[in-house]
């Protein structure tokens, strides 16, 4: 964990109070595609709060957490920043995040009651709220309409099952010409975790003490997903994905179908090829319909020297007004109840409603205090499965032992 954060967190990333008496606070994010939406929110806030300027800073995901951790240990943290489910526990326990429960309990413009309970719980600990839900995301089955039309196959819909998808992938598969029926990389949130839930399994037990790889339902689901490449050959291999991402395959017309989160919608819209040739459908059903869902949050540095301004801004970020601006600007599906249509309408060229509708069958992205550690255990153990040299049954015990060791050490 981030031991030493409490002692180190003494600065902040803002410019503080300028000579004019204005206060500038920093708002740190990691997604450039969402930057226009976040800046629109900042401008609306500034218009309602003269004297407070908000500086939106974008740091790519790969460097974001390195920079934030360094800031937490004493250099400087941004005043307000995005938080992720994989990281919240260590930052909350490190004492570097401000408790926002009182701000929201006393707010006259918003309330935690407007957000999905699972997301509020995700960013809370010991009766304190360390992040205000910003958005939510689910996973969809994107498909290439042009390839489907050429093959005379009906587009995917809510009736599709694993078998329907496999049959379509086999028909569409044309590896000799560099086109694959489906894109199935070794990926948890957009990939095999969805299939575990669809098969009636789970990734972690409710009490976060056991790995779902104890169960046949998980083993069967992950094997079926891996077999898309290693048995059926309808997906590129993992070595191919090491050279080209699933998005790169899809956006160049070399993948007829792929699993992509709602956060990729802007990327699909901004790409000329996918804007003209692609659309999205619900995930196929196994024993049941299911998708993983997650959501980001907005947090405030406990070390901020601009506490009043930062709290005002994070309160505004949770209002219906700010959430609608987020959706209208195509940034993400807003977490505030009743505002998700703003995102759907921003991308009317795609059937984005499927992302919203799938919340009826959504399972919160598996998490614990040390999510990234047990995710690495899963990933490393499954590599030979996705290379075709081992089966999931061969590595299940290794996953169970490794994941449950991480979980046991969290207590």
How should each PLM-predicted stretch be described?
Residues 278, 328-380, 384, 409-410:
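Long, aromatic- and glycine/proline-rich binding clefts that accommodate carbohydrate-like moieties
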Residues 169-171, 208-239, 283:
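Glycine-centered hinge/linker elements that transmit conformational signals in sensory
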Residues 44-115, 150-152, 249, 253-257, ...:
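Extracytoplasmic "Venus flytrap"/periplasmic binding protein-like
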Residues 1-26, 47, 341, 347, ...:
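Short, low-complexity disordered leader/linker segments with a strong preference
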Residues 43, 47-48, 53, 151, ...:
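Extracytoplasmic/periplasmic substrate-recognition and gating elements
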Residues 101-115, 158, 176, 201-220, ...:
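Short, solvent-exposed loop/beta-turn-alpha elements that line the ligand-binding surface or hinge
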Residues 85-140, 163-166, 277-281, 342-358:
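Hinge/lid segment of periplasmic solute-binding proteins
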């Amino acid at each position: 964990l981030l031991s030493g954060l409490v002692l180190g967190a003494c600065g902040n990333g803002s410019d503080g109070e300028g000579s004019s008496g204005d206060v500038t606070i920093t708002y740190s994010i990691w997604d450039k595609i969402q930057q226009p939406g976040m800046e629109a929110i900042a401008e609306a806030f500034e218009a309602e709060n003269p004297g407070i300027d908000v500086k939106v800073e974008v740091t790519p995901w790969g460097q974001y957490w390195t920079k934030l951790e360094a800031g937490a240990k004493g250099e400087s943290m941004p005043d307000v920043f995005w938080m992720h489910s994989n990281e919240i526990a260590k930052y909350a326990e490190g004492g570097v995040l401000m408790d926002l429960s009182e701000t929201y309990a006393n707010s006259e413009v918003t309330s935690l009651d407007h957000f999905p309970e699972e997301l509020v719980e995700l960013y809370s600990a010991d009766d304190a709220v360390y992040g205000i839900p910003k958005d939510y995301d689910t996973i969809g089955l994107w498909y290439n309409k042009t390839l489907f039309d050429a093959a005379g196959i009906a587009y995917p819909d809510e009736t599709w099952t694993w078998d329907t998808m496999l049959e379509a992938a086999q028909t569409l598969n044309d590896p000799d010409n560099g086109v694959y029926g489906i894109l199935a990389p070794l990926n948890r949130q957009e990939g095999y975790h969805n299939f575990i839930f669809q098969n009636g399994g789970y990734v972690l037990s409710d009490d976060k003490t056991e790995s779902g790889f104890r169960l046949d339902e998980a083993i069967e689901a992950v094997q079926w997903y891996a077999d898309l490449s290693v048995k059926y050959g309808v997906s590129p291999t993992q070595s191919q994905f090491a050279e080209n991402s699933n998005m790169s395959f899809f956006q160049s017309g070399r993948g007829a179908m792929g699993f992509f989160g709602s956060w990729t919608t802007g990327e699909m819209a901004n790409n000329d090829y996918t804007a003209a040739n692609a659309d999205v459908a619900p995930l196929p059903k196994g024993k049941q319909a299911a998708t993983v869902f997650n959501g980001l949050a907005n947090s405030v540095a406990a070390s901020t020297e601009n506490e009043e301004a930062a709290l005002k801004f994070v309160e505004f970020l949770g209002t219906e007004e700010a959430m609608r601006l987020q959706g209208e600007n195509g940034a993400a599906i807003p977490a505030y109840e009743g505002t998700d249509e703003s995102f759907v309408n921003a991308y009317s060229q795609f059937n984005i409603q499927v992302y919203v509708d799938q919340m009826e069958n959504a399972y919160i992205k598996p998490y614990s205090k040390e999510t990234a550690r047990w995710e690495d255990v899963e990933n490393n153990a499954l590599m030979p499965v996705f290379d075709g040299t081992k089966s999931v049954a061969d590595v299940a015990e290794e996953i169970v032992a490794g994941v449950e060791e991480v979980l046991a050490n969290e207590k």
